[in-house]
Amino acid sequence: MIEIYSRPGCPFCNKLITVVEYEGLPHIVYVLDRDYTREDFYEKFGEGSTFPQLILDGIHLGGCQESIKYMQEEKICCQI
């Protein structure tokens, strides 16, 4: 299961969500100020973390580019 921590209006969040949905991967999207606070986000991922952040089966992959790269390398998605 993929967990995406996003915020409204974030283009990288939208890109990552679009990729995951296009690939048909099971996921849940958590939205800042609806599902969690900024303090919760920094406590979970660290003060310097940016949006989005992705967790795959309990493993923190990181932001948009890191997550897509990992999923490509592991042949989970995005095979072009």
What are these regions (language model features)?
Residues M1-H27:
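Local sequence-structure signature of Cys/Sec-based thiol-disulfide redox active-site neighborhoods
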Residues P11, Y36, G62:
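Short alpha-helical
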Residues N14, T18, E39, K69:
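Alpha-helical elements of the RecA-like P-loop NTPase motor core of helicases
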Residues E23, K44-F45, E74:
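Residues at alpha-helix termini
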Residues H27-V29, H60:
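Conserved beta-strand scaffold positions in the cores of enzyme catalytic domains, especially
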Residues V31-G48:
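Thioredoxin-like thiol-disulfide oxidoreductase module
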Residues F45-I55, C64-Q65:
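Structural micro-motif
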Residues L56-I80:
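Non-catalytic, surface beta->alpha helical segment in thiol-disulfide oxidoreductase systems
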